[in-house]
């Protein structure tokens, strides 16, 4: 079962989606904990966004962090810095696409 507060945060992001920030389909895999409800696939395209629990397809960008840190990032109470990546609080395979995710939802 999905983490209810995490699921609510992700559903809230859909209303903040800015399609003009995306020029092609980009698939993100969010690994936000160890429980099945902490893992999500987010697909963004110029025509919309979708979010489904679990891993679906091959992601262009993977973000691994805690659900708490992700929710704080979304609500603006946390601003990541380079040290957070060096310490492993946030892990990604593509920083540029991660920044594009933030822009697509008006985060930060």
Task: Tell where the protein language model's regions lie, with residue ranges.
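Feature captures hydrophobic
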Residues: 1-108
């Amino acid at each position: 079962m999905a983490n209810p507060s995490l699921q609510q945060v992700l559903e809230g992001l859909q209303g903040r989606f800015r399609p003009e920030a995306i020029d092609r389909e980009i698939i993100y895999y969010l690994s936000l904990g160890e429980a099945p409800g902490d893992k999500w696939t987010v697909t963004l395209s110029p025509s919309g966004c979708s979010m489904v629990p679990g891993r679906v397809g091959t992601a262009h960008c993977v973000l691994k962090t805690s659900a708490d840190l992700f929710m704080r990032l979304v609500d603006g109470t946390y601003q990541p810095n380079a040290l957070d990546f060096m310490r492993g609080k946030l892990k990604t395979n593509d920083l540029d696409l991660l920044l594009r995710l933030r822009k697509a939802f008006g985060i930060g």
